């Protein structure tokens, strides 16, 4: 019986159910709108820890991240959402009413600003899910990382815009899309994001050296059995 529950089809089905459950919790968490930042942060945290690393339970880990990061995530969300909204409205108005080369240049700048702000959103909530930092520090880190990892930023922007396009084109199937896509999208993002975040994760302190009076054999045993944080596994 144990082999049955450990078989690949059963494991995959269990993960699929967890992803559906995570999507439902995420969508409910987004209803007040101002909580979207905390929900996004908790979604990323839970996807990586529970779905990818098999650590913890969906509801417990989601709730933990949502509560712990609520204040900073809400601040980041409000700032970036307002900026994104202003740039979107400006771009739309210029496309409808703008004429001439100057308008074209402004449209280009507005669109570039819109995409860069979107990139900051993608990075900001992932950073917040991993590190303890305030809203200002989160945005600063997101700006730095999005520029420093330009190739990965482009990939994740394409993925994000592709999902948005899918939602707009398949609006008739929106309930099904929303039930499946959020966690699937976050998992795809995490494949790139985790490789980036690990570069900024402080190394664990080494166990003790021989100079500290510890027997080398004991030190090797301690190193071998030392528990690593789940995100370093």
Describe these PLM feature segments.
Residues 1-97, 101-106, 110, 120-122, ...:
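Helix-coil boundary and N-terminal low-complexity module in membrane systems
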């Amino acid at each position: 019986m144990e082999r049955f529950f450990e078989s690949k089809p059963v494991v995959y089905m269990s993960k699929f159910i967890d992803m559906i459950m995570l999507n439902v919790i995420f969508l409910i968490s987004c209803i007040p709108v101002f909580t979207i930042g905390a929900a996004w942060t908790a979604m990323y945290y839970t996807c990586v820890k529970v779905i990818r690393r098999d650590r913890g339970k969906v509801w417990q880990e989601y709730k933990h991240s949502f509560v712990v990061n609520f204040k900073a995530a809400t601040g980041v969300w409000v700032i970036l959402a307002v900026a994104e909204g202003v740039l979107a409205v400006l771009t739309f108005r210029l496309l409808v009413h703008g004429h001439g080369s100057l308008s074209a240049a402004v449209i280009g700048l507005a669109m570039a600003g819109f995409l860069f702000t979107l990139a900051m959103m993608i990075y900001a909530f992932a950073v917040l899910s991993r590190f303890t930092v305030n809203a200002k520090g989160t945005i600063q880190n997101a700006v730095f990382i999005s520029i420093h990892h330009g190739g990965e930023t482009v990939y994740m922007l394409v993925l994000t815009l592709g999902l948005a396009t899918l939602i707009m084109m398949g609006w008739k199937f929106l309930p099904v899309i929303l039930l499946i896509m959020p966690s699937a999208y976050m998992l795809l993002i995490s494949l790139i994001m985790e490789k980036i975040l690990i570069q900024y994760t402080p190394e664990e302190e080494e166990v003790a050296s021989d100079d500290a009076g510890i027997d080398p054999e004991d030190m090797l045993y301690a190193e071998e059995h030392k528990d690593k944080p789940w995100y370093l596994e």
